Amino acid sequence: STIICTAVLITAAVRGNIMFNTVLELLKSRNYKAIREIFMDMNEADVAALLQQFYDDHEVEKYELPLLFRLLNKDVAADVFAYMDSDTQMMLINAFTDKELQEIVDDLYLDDTVDIIEEMPANVVARIIKSADAETRKQINQILKYPKDSAGSIMTTEYVYLHRSYTAKEALDWIRHVGMVKETVNTLYVTENRKLVGVLSLLDIVTADDNDKIEDIMEDNVISVDTLEDKEYVASMFSKYDFLSLPVVDRENRMVGIVTFDDAMDVIEEETTEDFSKMAAVAPSDDSYFKTSVFTHAKNRIAWLLILMLSATLTGAIVNKYQSAFAAVPVLVSFLSMLSGTGGNCGSQTS
């Protein structure tokens, strides 16, 4: 399976390089129509990865990235933007006009906007906030007030709620009316005076009779999390219950938002990376490993390297001096593997 995964990654990398070179040649010849057609046939995540290559390639002029981004269909531009890393996003924001930035912010999902804001310097944040409408600014500020590692900090307020008195037909009409601007319509939440009272899926409504009441087909035993719940625990709930989204409530059981599956996966990836860093005795970093300077990597490891080098030197001296003791008391040999492990620790720190 490892060989298969490696082969898939290599194939993807080769395809990515071929696409990069193709678009680069079209860009040099100013064949913008052909580039647009290529973008239209690609998934948003693949387009973002391609544009990321242009940002990372030092031989490509930086002004060409905003030019390529402007060739995207406006319907997918915000989705592509959300997939990019924070450095590329900041570069594009600085290149955007106020009107262009407003269009992107209007089309972004709220949780993506908050994620971007959390990675940006104050002057860029000010531009983003200024570009948002009053209601979006209010929702952004609501999410930003929650602690960094809480459920509230990773939730979105863009969910579909229903009244228990709706019929299935009325519910479908409501979903059609508001669904396009919501994060998801797969899971629907029933509220009464803002309090969460039930949950059901879109499939439940589609397969029900038109006159069936929502309160008759909803599930009233709803699993939810508090706004201040640790986000790592929230992510574990998705693994346990196979949720696509999870409702977030305040202390009075009033529904304030949902955490979606993609945000839970981001948390799991972040926590896994942090755990691996701790296993190697390296301070976890929010920055990309490959974009962190050699000096920063060295600074994070130098203290442990010095300690391990000194302990390895001391261990070697002790072993050489007391070789006769090892011969006289063989049980001491069992400690050699532990002592020699410092060499492996040095290797993991250096790599």
Q: Positions of the model-derived regions?
A:
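Alpha-helical transmembrane segments and their membrane-interface boundaries
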Residues: 272-351
